[in-house]
């Protein structure tokens, strides 16, 4: 069977790539498959009929997570999110914990099944990530401020070996210079001003999916903390998606290469957002599929509405 890309199908049907991606994620294109990186669509696929705009009220993703967390529900989307998010975000940064070990820590609040040679920070930061996600669910509607971002860093790095180093500021901006690969980041003396400028810019945006992604690229370029910038940055994106009704996403280990390439391309000379946005959209597709797996149908986000989905 011959297959087409999202872009080829969009051109053929006269709609946006985002609409085609949504049709795929919602299972509305027969034979469409996701290979872990992109959707493959049969060349003879039929364009789905537009649905009526009259839809019953639906719960937001934030409301679902709040309810499942409050009920201490196991085996639901909240449970799955906590494990998958902590495992992938920490693993991207070098954690040695497996997915099963991460699940064990979340479900039992013990380390009984974790090997004796496992770095203690991998365990502590995993437990801290669970707390950070709980904090975000409880405070998602709060304004995004410097203090809020610092609070996430304090939660993530609290009790780690870094927290006992004189030069490491837990919950505060870096004191020493750091780099990301071959790219320079903001000097410690300039971080506060750079963060204030970033938040002022973001506050004037429409807080769309693209704005959240742009904030992340700019935040990672500043790299305001001594360590933990990637994880804090991804937590911030999660919070802002929940706040503004945008389908959230998890950057998985499988997406790692495309994620870092996307950041580099956006932050570099060409300032191209395409790869990073596509990577995040693939994550949204996976999250939407996970929601359907657990029987949830949620209200479309603002970007979906603009595309007429």
Model-inferred region functions:
Residues 1-13, 17-22, 26-28, 34, ...:
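FIC/Doc superfamily catalytic core
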Residues 38-39:
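Short, basic, alpha-helical segments at the C-terminal edge of helix-turn-helix-like DNA-binding modules
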């Amino acid at each position: 069977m011959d297959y087409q890309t999202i872009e080829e199908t969009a051109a053929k049907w006269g709609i946006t790539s985002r609409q085609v991606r949504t049709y795929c994620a919602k299972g509305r294109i027969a034979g469409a498959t996701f290979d872990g990186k992109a959707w493959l669509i049969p060349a003879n696929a039929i364009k789905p009929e537009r649905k009526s705009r009259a839809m019953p009220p639906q719960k937001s993703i934030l409301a679902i997570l709040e309810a499942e967390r409050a009920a201490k529900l196991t085996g639901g989307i909240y449970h799955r999110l906590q494990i998958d998010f902590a495992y992938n975000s920490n693993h991207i940064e070098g954690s040695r914990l497996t997915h099963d070990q991460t699940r064990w820590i979340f479900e039992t609040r013990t380390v009984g099944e974790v090997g004796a040679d496992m770095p203690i920070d991998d365990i502590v930061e995993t437990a801290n990530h669970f707390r950070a996600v709980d904090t975000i669910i409880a405070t998602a509607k709060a304004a995004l401020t410097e203090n809020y971002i610092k609070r996430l860093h304090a939660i993530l790095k609290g009790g780690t070996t870094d927290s006992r180093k004189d030069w490491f500021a837990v919950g505060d901006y870096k004191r020493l210079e750091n780099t990301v690969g071959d790219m320079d980041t903001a000097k410690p003396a300039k971080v506060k001003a750079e963060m204030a400028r970033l938040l002022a810019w973001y506050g004037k945006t429409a807080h769309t999916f693209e704005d959240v992604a742009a904030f992340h690229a700019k935040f990672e370029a500043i790299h305001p903390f001594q360590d933990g910038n990637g994880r804090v940055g991804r937590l911030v994106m999660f919070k802002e998606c929940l706040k503004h009704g945008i389908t959230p996403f998890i950057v998985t280990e499988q997406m790692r290469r495309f994620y870092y390439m996307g950041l580099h391309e956006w932050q570099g000379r060409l300032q191209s957002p395409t790869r990073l946005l596509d990577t995040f959209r693939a994550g949204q597709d996976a999250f939407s599929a996970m929601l359907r797996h657990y029987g949830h149908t949620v209200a479309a986000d603002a970007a979906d509405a603009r595309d007429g989905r």
